[in-house]
């Protein structure tokens, strides 16, 4: 029997426990637009009046989160950095007269506050079918090269499979490019994955969630699975939205911000079932976290700290019948945290 063990990076990922997802880009400035709706979004609309990535990262740090993921390019194709391989980027916006770089500001903020750096990239985008498969792979690998080659150490690369159904990517070439630039990086869910998607966007892992799998859920658009050919250890991640309706900011769904009780419940359904908790907040058109969302995240973090930050002193030893746990006296216990010894 082959023993399946996690890598050092995967063990670190499990210890991260809670992260933040930031959907911010051209769609932030176009109310009501949806994935793949074909609507034109002029880059001239991108002009945050007070972008402050430190505002984002300070908030999640205070809430007890340990990693953050920025959407660098969503399905619309807009690049949040001045990519040499497209004109559809921050370089052709009025923000900072075209000299701004959201990715740079995000990465610098994460490093300042000791938050692990994650970058999201959608391999597919509107109109990509007009390129030949090789042309699209060239474009994709060139942009990934910019993200992984120009911003120092990146801890996590988050690929979104949505929209990639049917395209045959050059897997070997892609993985070689990524691993050569960032040998210790964690890759989410695709091609040579180190972590896996839970299979829903509700933030919920099943009680039977296992980190040892032989196939992966690929996209919300299909029930097809990606066959891994062999069993692998892949920690699970549960992504979900602070607001019930949108990943990007909307001025019309503030009433759907989740309550502290809902967030705590999702913590139990994710971390409590052996998965990571990844909450999305869409920064607003100022380039700041919406006040209501930021306040709710801090309230949630305070509640998690209240429940878990002062464990009861104990010792334990293994016996023939299991494990004996000894406390320092009579105690009322309302939570038990169990973890596999890896």
Give a label for each model feature.
Residues 1-342:
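Mature catalytic domains of secreted/periplasmic carbohydrate-active enzymes
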């Amino acid at each position: 029997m082959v023993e399946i063990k996690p890598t050092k990076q995967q063990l670190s990922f499990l210890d991260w426990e809670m992260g933040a997802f930031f959907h911010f880009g051209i769609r932030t400035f176009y109310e009501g637009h949806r994935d793949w709706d074909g609507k034109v979004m002029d880059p001239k609309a991108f002009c945050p009046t007070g972008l402050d990535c430190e505002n984002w990262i300070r908030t999640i740090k205070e809430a007890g989160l340990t990693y953050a993921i920025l959407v660098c390019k969503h399905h619309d194709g807009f690049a949040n950095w001045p990519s040499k391989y497209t004109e559809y980027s921050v370089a052709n916006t009025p923000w900072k007269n075209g000299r701004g770089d959201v990715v740079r500001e995000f990465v610098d903020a994460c490093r300042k506050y000791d938050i692990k750096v994650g970058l999201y990239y959608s391999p597919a985008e509107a109109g990509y079918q007009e390129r030949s498969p090789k042309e699209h792979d060239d474009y994709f690998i060139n942009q990934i090269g910019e993200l992984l080659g120009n911003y120092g150490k990146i801890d996590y690369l988050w690929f979104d499979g949505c929209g990639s159904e049917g395209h045959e990517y050059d897997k070997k070439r892609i993985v070689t490019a990524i691993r050569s630039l960032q040998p210790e990086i964690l890759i989410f869910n695709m091609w040579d994955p180190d972590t896996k998607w839970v299979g829903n966007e509700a933030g919920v892992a099943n009680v039977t969630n296992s980190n040892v799998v032989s196939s992966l859920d690929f996209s919300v658009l299909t029930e097809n699975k990606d066959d891994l050919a062999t069993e692998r250890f892949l920690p699970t991640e549960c992504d979900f939205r602070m607001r019930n309706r949108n990943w990007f900011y909307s001025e019309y769904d503030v009433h759907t911000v989740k309550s502290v009780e809902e967030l705590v419940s999702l913590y139990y359904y994710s971390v409590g079932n052996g998965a990571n908790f990844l909450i999305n907040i869409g920064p607003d058109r100022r380039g700041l976290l919406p006040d209501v969302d930021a306040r709710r995240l801090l309230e949630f973090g305070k509640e998690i700290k209240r429940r878990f930050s002062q464990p009861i002193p104990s010792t334990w030893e293994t016996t023939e019948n299991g494990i004996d746990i000894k406390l320092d006296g009579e105690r009322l216990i309302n939570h038990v945290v169990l973890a596999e010894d890896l």
